[in-house]
Structures are given as C-alpha cells and as structure tokens.
Amino acid sequence: MNAFLENQFGLAGKRALVTGAARGIGRAIAEALCAAGAEVCIHFNKSEGEAKKLVAQLESQGGRVFAVGGDLTDSKQADTLIAKIESRWNGLDILVNNAGDLVQRSKVEAFSDDLLDRVVKLNFHSAVYVTRRAIPLLRRGIDPSIINLSSVAAHNGGSNGATIYAATKAAIHTYTRGLAKELAPAIRVNAISPGVALTDFHRTHTTPEALETIAGNTPLKRLGTAEDHGAAVVFLCGKGASFITGEVIEINGGLWLA
C-alpha cells in the first residue's frame, strides 16, 4: 500500500468492536478491518465455535484479534461487553453495530408479543445498548466512528413476513442520522444498507426460488456476498471519510431502486 492509500484508508493502531461478527457480513467486516491494520474484538452470542475459529484464522495471518460473548438484547450483558473492552483498551476507535436477524418470517397479525420483543430488541435496542455504553470509550478514541447495519428493507418495507424487521431497520436509518448530529463533531456516525447477500441469514429465511427472483430484479443482476461489505466499512472508518457523517451507503446492487 503506497503512502497515500495507507494514510487515507489504513487503520493501523485503530481498535474496533464488531458485534455479531462470528458469521456472515459481520465476519467479513471483521476480516476487512483486521486486514486494514485494526485490532478487532469479535463479538458473538451463540456462535462461540465460529468466533474461535475466526480468531485463530486471523491470528495465523498476523492479525490482532480476540473474541467476547454476550446476548446484546440484554442491556446488562451489553454493558459487560463494553466493560471487558475497556479493561483491555483505554479507548475505542471503531464500533460496528452489526448484530441482528429476521428471527422468523411472520405476518404482523400473527406476531406474538414475545416475537415482537425479540425482533425489536435484537435489531434496534441492541445497537442502542452497546452504543450508549461505548460513547465514553469512543470519546477517548482516535477519529472515532460508529457504523450501523441497516437493510434495503428499510426502503421497501421488506419482503413477505419481514415487515417488523424492516421497521427496525428504518429505525436504524433515523437513529444513525440523529446520532450523527448528537455526537458531532467528536464522533462520526454512518450506516451501510445491505440488500440480499448469500449468507446464513438468507439461506435460513429465503427460498432458493425467491433468491433467484431477487437476483433477476437487482440492477447488477446478482446477489450480494458478505465480502461486498467490508471495504465500505474500512473506507468509512478511515481518514478518507473524515468529512462523512449521517450517511447510509447502499450496498445492494441497486436493489433499493428496483
């Protein structure tokens, strides 16, 4: 990497927390941040085995990385996660709020109170729980930034049975922009908005036939991959994006236009 690219896009010396980083898009983001030179905390909830394998993989490549578990729908466990990071680092430079899931497809009229609580807590409350506790650490960071994970569903209301999930991602859009104003000029806040990527998320919740249709309806005529998202996060966290805040970057092949 030449001097210009290193200065604008390198993350050497940065400390990053990626929630839900054991699999899928979160994993790809953690890999990209590590490759750019950041030291990365891989958060996991139920995927401890995958998290340990990722740590071993990145360490074998010369990366500085460790894993911490916790259920971020529980505010106390979110507090504990940040406390563990604070005990290791004196500050935090990058927070990626990636944890989230559709949980299950369901029409609104069939949504139980328990399912509603799980979907909203996992996709919205968790980001608030982690962020509010991490802000003091971020204030001690170097050009700190927060990256939230939204979804193309925030624009179109989601696919069949995903209305509540889509609403939580629309909340992430608004939360990102409001938080960007609230934390400026000290901390930048942006989001990325994936479309349909071939990860465990859509292998679990979307049929092969639906995936084929979505690919055909996407202007770039393919589905996304987890790896499509890491470079954008690296960019948003570096000096090259130092005048960007409150933005939601669409990484969905133009699906949000369709």
Q: Model-derived features: where do they sit?
A:
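Conserved glycine-rich cofactor-binding loop
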Residues: R15, A22-R23
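Substrate-binding pocket helix/loop in short-chain dehydrogenase/reductase
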Residues: S106-V120, H202, A210, I214
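Short C-terminal tail/terminal secondary-structure segment
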Residues: N2-N7, L102-R105, N156, V234, ...
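Active-site helix of classical SDR
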Residues: T131, T168, T176
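Alpha-helical segment proximal to the catalytic Tyr-Lys
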Residues: P136, A180-P185, S242
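Short, small/polar-rich loop/turn modules that mediate ligand/substrate recognition or access, typified
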Residues: G91, D143, A184-R188, I244-G246
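Residue(s) in the substrate-gating loop at a strand-loop-helix junction
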Residues: S151
